[in-house]
């Protein structure tokens, strides 16, 4: 990619991001370095009951909460009387892709479908990509997952390569790149601009 191509895309950064999520982030600025999180959350417009219903549609959440009885007995046996917490484990592996990231992918993919986007794009090298791909498949959307996988010598990170295969198993197109800022400053913006997909990226 030429410097001019990068400049052309990054120069349209705000416009591309606005069209990829229908949010003008400037409305939420609070000073030079901060932004108004509470005001931002108001635009979600969903109650917790509605979010739970959306999650149930695609089998996200309601994961088991397991009390660790043996550990709790041990803690009580060595703690002063009346002390010693009860310890529970939340089994997020019971989510569709075996990760708590299914919860994070839930609403962006739902919003993309509700708003009529043809697909979603996310940049991630881990569990979030599989979660986005899985949710997109359930909602009938296309998905492109962009991964930073390779070092400068062309060696792929085994965990990221494996996550890429997981994304593909859910029907996503996986694009893999050498680690570097261009994935975020150019590749994602270019894809969003060219395809008109929803940006489900965390970054």
Locate the predicted segments by residue.
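PLP-dependent amino-acid enzyme catalytic core
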Residues: 1-203
């Amino acid at each position: 990619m030429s410097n001019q191509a990068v400049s052309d895309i990054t120069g349209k950064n705000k416009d591309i991001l606005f069209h990829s999520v229908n949010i003008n982030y400037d409305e939420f600025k609070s000073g030079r370095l901060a932004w108004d999180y509470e005001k931002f959350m108001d635009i979600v417009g969903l109650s917790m009951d509605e979010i739970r219903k959306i999650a149930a549609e695609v089998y996200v959440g309601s994961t088991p909460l397991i009390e660790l009885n043996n550990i709790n007995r041990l803690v009580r046996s060595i703690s002063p009387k009346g002390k010693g917490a009860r310890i529970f484990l939340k089994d997020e592996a019971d989510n569709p892709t075996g990760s708590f990231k299914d919860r994070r992918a839930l609403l962006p993919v739902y919003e993309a479908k509700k708003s009529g986007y043809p697909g979603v794009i996310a940049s991630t090298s881990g569990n979030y990509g599989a979660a986005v791909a899985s949710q997109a498949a359930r909602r009938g959307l296309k998905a492109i997952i962009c991964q930073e996988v390779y070092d400068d010598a062309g060696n792929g990170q085994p965990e990221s390569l494996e996550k890429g295969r997981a994304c593909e198993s859910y029907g996503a197109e996986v694009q893999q790149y050498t680690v570097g800022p261009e994935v975020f400053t150019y590749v994602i913006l270019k894809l969003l601009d060219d395809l008109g997909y929803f940006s489900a990226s965390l970054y």
